[in-house]
Amino acid sequence: MSLLWLLSIGGTANATDWYYVGPDASGNQLFIDNDSVQKSDYDALLWLRVNELGGDELRYKVYISRYNRTMETLKVDAYMADGTPYENVEYNENPEPIEGNTNGQAIYNLLWQ
């Protein structure tokens, strides 16, 4: 699967099939947009929603490399509690390792185990 093709997948404004992942260390609730998941034997691209305790919602476009066991944030869309968007950020950072008992590990396990 071409990374360029994966990066072309659109946003999540109309996402309706959110799968609950669990809480993060801060108590925020994490969900995967099932409709956005593009997965192969080697990698995956998906949208991850984080409902913060204060009511704001963050949506992360993430790329996961299965065999490198890394996760990379490509984009973040932030919304206020009333749904008003307040920030859209494109990222160009190095992938981070997926380790231990983390959200990245939970998502990795949902995708490939």
What is each stretch, according to the model?
Residues 4-12:
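C-terminal segment of classical bacterial N-terminal signal peptides
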Residues 11-113:
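N-terminal secretory-pathway/extracellular module detecting exported/lumenal segments
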